[in-house]
Structures are given as structure tokens and as C-alpha cells.
């Protein structure tokens, strides 16, 4: 018979392991960072609507582009009011997720907000416009916030979250969590070649362009990385495709050490892409709305990190 002190202590809003709670706090921190970035002076001008939002409209079907054009008009005509609202909402989401009694409320509210921003602010990440590229942030950073909100949802006391093979399976189950991982990383394989990065000079030009306006030390790193890609566009695209495919299926492998090795590879790959191709999300340029997909994909990898279980995984 177990002593009461040995049992997991139910927390407000669901049973949350220390690991799961830490991951929730990281997600909250990224939301807070987004709110702070939204308060940059340039965001309160028409440049935000014209330079950040407007380019995402091009190429989308009219059913997607028309509402985006309408939303763009509102942001263009009321830059201060709309941006203040955006910044405050994101700060509120971060604080709500970080404060344990309102964690569920914050996660729940972040899902529709993320979907709205993904549509009206990111043009669905370029998925329908032909501009989706996993190196530059496809399928859109903000949709990953919604995914993480679902995967990090506090498990109710009746759920067998203690038996989950990784934190992502604690609420929705292992089968659903693995399927989401597979779909996301498999899409990277498709978009790697659909984006045209395998064309001669495409990847080199893309990486080189990211150095514009960046601090000298970061521009040096990016330019040297661009030199390494010169003439190797197809080869690098093939390697990336193979790595993305391996990461996609790795969650189905029966060997824990092998799964962890693939997740480490995913973390390293995310870090390289975040620095070299995404330039830390452009946070040094004064108009970044988020740190891009690099940190979010890294957090996602940690959410899928294998843990010791007390029993069979929940399907």
C-alpha cells in the first residue's frame, strides 16, 4: 500500500509533472517574448502592416486572401490600436500559461489566437501560396504554438499521463501524438523540394539574403555558411530531406536510445537553421514578431523526449 506522500499530488487545472510544467513555462516565456517584440517602435507604424503582413497575402486563394486583405486594411488604418491589442493579448497569454491556476485558460485561448494569426498574419505559412519553406519558417511559427498548447495540455486526474512514453502523449495519447509529429516533419520533406531550394544558387541566395541588416558577428556567420552552400543546393536539399524523413519516423522506433539520438539530431538541426537561415528570427532588425520556428521545434522535440513510464502507453 502506498503512502499518501508517495502519490502524485493533483495540481490546480490537472495533474502536471515537473517536466511537463517546465515545458509549459518555456512556452509561456516564448509568448511573453512575442509580446515584448510586438512593442517595438516600428510595430506601431504602418510599416508593420505593409512590410510584415501584406507580403503574406500574395499567392493565396481568394477565399484566404480576401479576409487577409480586410484585416490588413484595419491594421494599416489603425496601427497603434491594433498593435497595442496584439502585444497585450500575447503578454496575457504568456502570463496565463505561466500562472498555474490559469494555465488551462491560457493554453485554450492561445489556440484560436494562434490560428487567427496564422491566417491573417502569416497567410497560413505559405502552405497554399507555394512559398512554404521549412528553412525560413514553414508551416508558420504561430501554428506551432497551437500544436504545443494541445500537446502540453494538463492531463486530468483520470488520464494515465504517468504511463505516457513522452510528455506529448500525456493528454491526447501516444498514437495521436506520434501521428502529429509524423505529419509535421513529413511536410518538411515535401516543402524542402517544393520550395525550389534544390535549384542552382537558390539556397545560397536565400542564406546570403539573411545577413542583410544583421549585426556584424551574425552576418559573418551567415555569410560563411552561405559560402559552404555554394553549388551544393541539390545535395543539401537531399540531405535535409533524408534527415527530415528520419526525424519524422523516429517516434515509431522501438529503441529508446535511437529515438533520443534522432531527437538530439532534430535539436541540432533546429539550432543550425535558426542561426544560419532564420537569423534568430530577425529579432535584431526591429520588426520581428516572434523568434521563428527554430525554438518552437526545439521545444517540440523536448516534448517528445522519451521518459520512463510506470506502465503501458495510452493509445
Q: Which residues does each PLM region occupy?
A:
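Extended, low-polarity transmembrane helix blocks
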Residues: 1-92, 99-315
